[in-house]
Regions:
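Extracytoplasmic soluble-region selector
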Residues: 2-7, 19-138
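Core hydrophobic alpha-helical transmembrane segments of single-pass membrane proteins
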Residues: 11-19
Length: 138
């Protein structure tokens, strides 16, 4: 009886060790997703890169970044007829807010906040988990 119990206990330990090894050695798979709003479209590509398209259909808006956090940055922007595109990359994990300024043709200035939540996986990979883009209260 003791021999059977010992064998079952050893088998259970082996199964637990194998299951833990499989869970801990899973390869990192970045998540891509799209977040759309009334005047923006944000595409997270390969986990740590964000393409932010800001609407300019009426051609009366000029977008610029006025404040950037330490956990992400914009490395380039492109302005076309219908939108302004910002390429944003994650630099570190955490939550950060980037402030965009929109200047309308009539001189009116509106501020918008891009808020990102970034997590770290397997100590080296960054993943953008959530995106929000909202107009700030004046």
């Amino acid at each position: 009886m003791k021999k059977k119990l010992t064998i079952l206990l050893v088998l259970a330990i082996i199964v637990l060790v194998v299951a833990a090894a499989i869970l801990l050695n899973r390869p990192y798979k970045p998540t891509s997703f799209v977040a759309d709003g009334e005047i923006f479209s944000a595409t997270v590509d390969n986990g740590n890169t964000l393409i932010l398209d800001l609407d300019n259909d009426s051609k009366n808006r000029e977008w610029s970044i006025t404040q950037a956090p330490e956990c992400f940055t914009s490395d380039f922007s492109t302005v076309t007829e219908n939108c302004s595109e910002f390429h944003i990359i994650a630099l570190n994990d955490g939550k950060g807010v980037m402030v965009f300024q929109c200047v309308l043709d009539d001189g009116t200035v509106e501020d918008y906040e891009l808020t990102l939540s970034i997590s770290r996986h397997q100590k080296t990979y960054l993943q953008i988990d959530s995106v929000s883009f909202e107009k700030t209260a004046a």
